[in-house]
Design a protein with these regions (language model features):
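Short linear motifs embedded in intrinsically disordered, proline/glycine-rich low-complexity segments
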Residues: 1-180
Length: 180
């Protein structure tokens, strides 16, 4: 796992022209909540090998946990840690399901480049940018990320992919409870 002081990813998604005041009080997990999220990630996705720590946090602090490929899962799993510090505005009819907190995950091929140098290249960085943008969407829109609303980027995420939209769903390859 990455060292908390090691800013493995110095790619910033934030506009440098924003006032410093906006960055002074991001919503963050308590230490206990962070341990619970990390425990959940490790139980359902695997051991966290590294963490890309966010350098500037305007509203929530979103780190990206990296779970490497294994024999059982021949792909990287990237999971946000921090999105759930903000309670989403969930529709009343769904309140009983306690969906106001969530994290996001994405699976990437086993040969995906996830070293610091490759993060300077949008061809490798775009999945991390996507996770960070989606993690902040409930704050920007004062709503929640529901199941299966397509979000169209209107352009390819990067020059090396034709992917241009995302559809949030529950993880399909985890054991029972992994979606909790």
């Amino acid at each position: 796992k990455g060292d908390p002081e090691d800013d493995s990813c110095d790619h910033s998604d934030n506009d440098d022209t924003q006032d410093e005041e906006e960055f002074s009080n991001p919503e963050v997990y308590t230490e206990e909540e962070m341990e619970a999220v990390e425990g959940h990630i490790e139980q359902y996705f695997g051991k966290v090998e590294n963490v890309f720590h966010e350098l500037v946090s305007p509203d929530i602090h979103v780190d990206i946990c990296i779970v490497p490929p294994t024999e059982e899962r021949d792909y990287y799993t990237l999971v946000t840690m921090g999105m759930g510090a903000h309670r989403m505005n969930v529709p009343e009819e769904l309140a009983e399901y306690k969906l106001e907190r969530a994290e996001l995950a994405i699976a990437l091929p086993a040969d995906w480049k996830l070293v610091q140098e490759s993060m300077q290249d949008e061809r490798w960085y775009w999945p991390i940018r996507l996770l960070k943008v989606l993690a902040r969407l409930p704050i920007a829109t004062d709503t929640s990320l529901g199941f299966a609303p397509t979000m169209d980027n209107k352009a390819n995420f990067a020059e090396n992919t034709k992917l241009c939209a995302d559809i949030p769903t529950c993880p399909k390859s985890t054991e029972q409870g992994g979606e909790a």
